[in-house]
Amino acid sequence: MIKNTGGTVISMPFGKNIITFNSNRHFFRGENQQYLKSLPSLRRKQEGKSKYECELIKAIAVMRSFQFLKFIWKIDVVPFWEAKLSDINIDALAQHYGFDTCLLDLTNDFRTALFFATCKYDYKTDSYRPLTKKDIEATENSKYGVIFHSPNWVLDYLNGGSFEWHMHRLNNPDKGPYSFYSGYLGGMAFQIGYQPLMRCHHQSGYIMPMMNATPLQNDNRFEKLRFLQSEELSNRVYEMMDKGKKIFPHEGIGKSLDILRTIQKAVIFSEDDLLYAYDYGVVDKKMFPTIDNLRKAITALQVDGKFVSIQKDEIDYPISTSALQEINDEYNGRNLLDVIGNMIHQYPEQRWYREQRCIDIYGKLI
């Protein structure tokens, strides 16, 4: 099928055209200990909160992701990619670069899942390291790693996983596009495809929206593979994956890590950010009938001891000219088609759409 051919442009129901990589027919997710619930970071922050609080927490997460997009747009390769190759999947990028979202990571590469199931993230260095004896023996749950597995025809939007979803929407006048935060896309896996920043395709990444979906532990579409952790296994996998570089590459965006972490904790937003959250975040319109209602509620909220504020002007996260040049130097000059196979398969209307995006971004075809 053409949909399984790497380099094919596919239009997704969330409104993005993505360039696919080859499908391996299976989905995996690795976790380095047993958890009671495997849920996206946003859902974990909403646990135990009222529906009112959950809506505000969601709006803040969406605004932070939007600010992330505005920041990375300063990097030459990001607007160029959107102008010439495919749409930027900001939610997937935000998920892979440390922002709270309603998305859960999956991969179609077993080794990638095994790496995440046997190694530990180091927040200080933004990298992974092998498990130590202390890590493994910390609790009864940390003695075991878990890998979730499902055939991709069960979950994949491109390979049968969307059949029931399409049947339910045959007579639905709302044809989308659908926000990940709407709940309409829950429980299906979507290929992230190739993106200008590298983590997503290095990890053969898929995302599963879980705004309302059940935790993986209770999802009978997944089998759960539990194994005993050991330092020997962890070190062996760590070395096999080139100390994590094969799936967690050291790239230009890492030079702005401090800025990304500032955005991840942001409490000051623009009116444009708020409008985006109100619309794209699918804020409950019965609870907040107008954007003014949302503004009033969210500015009364404290996050980590600080009140949220909304201002008219855009929030700028400055980066020095030299630092930005260093980042650009790591991306500019690369043949962006190399990793794709030097060919993009697309329909004429998709090519026309890309040309229009180029004109929107640069004012002309380049």
Show where each model-derived region lies.
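Catalytic-core elements of nucleic-acid end-processing and repair enzymes
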Residues: 1-366
